[in-house]
Amino acid sequence: MSTALTTLTAKLAKQFDMGDGSDLVNTLKATCFKSGTQVTDAQMTALLIVANQYGLNPFTREIYAFPDKGGIVPVVGLDGWSRIINNHDQFDGMDFAQDDESCTCTIYRKDRSHPVKVTEWMSECRRSTGPWQSHPKRMLRHKAMIQCARLAFGFSGIFEQDEAERIIEADAPKRIDPATGEVTTILFDVIAALDAVEACADSESLATVWKAEGAKA
């Protein structure tokens, strides 16, 4: 383990009263990254730098990460965003105004006479993923709050999960249907595919898995 990672882990452990942090690295890697991901010390160090900068607790998934091209995309959960907003010295409350089409968040600062106001639109933000289908207004409210907080307090280098997923998708290879011109993003999880193959008990199940994983690629 690198000196930087040891130092950052110890600092995090002290912040949350968890001893010296000597046995926490493997737990952190399992908590902060998708199961089965091979996490490097450099990736873990990068995440802990951000966690320490914003005072976020990775053990409760206030912050976690998506691996990306050897680096990471730091993802802050809703509880994490709530923490860094409410802990800001100049935070003086927020308001929301919402209808079926949009949500406007207004954040007030103690040191400014004019509040910061941001509007997010359902037509621009809604996706086909589960939360956006089951709780679209709640998701839009979260989006408006986070974008407003960025402008009000200058938070940078961190993302919410929806943004992180869009970043990963943008970097993923694309498949184009020559007949229709339709573009499909290929999200192929190599580690998950290998795990599925290794779990096969016979040639028949292997053929089934191989066919299913091949269709994804």
Which residues make up each language-model segment?
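Polyanion-binding surfaces on beta-sheet-dominated domains and ring/shell assemblies
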Residues: 1-192
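Charged/polar low-complexity intrinsically disordered segments, enriched in acidic residues
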Residues: 185-206
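Amphipathic, non-membrane alpha-helical rod segments
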Residues: 203-217
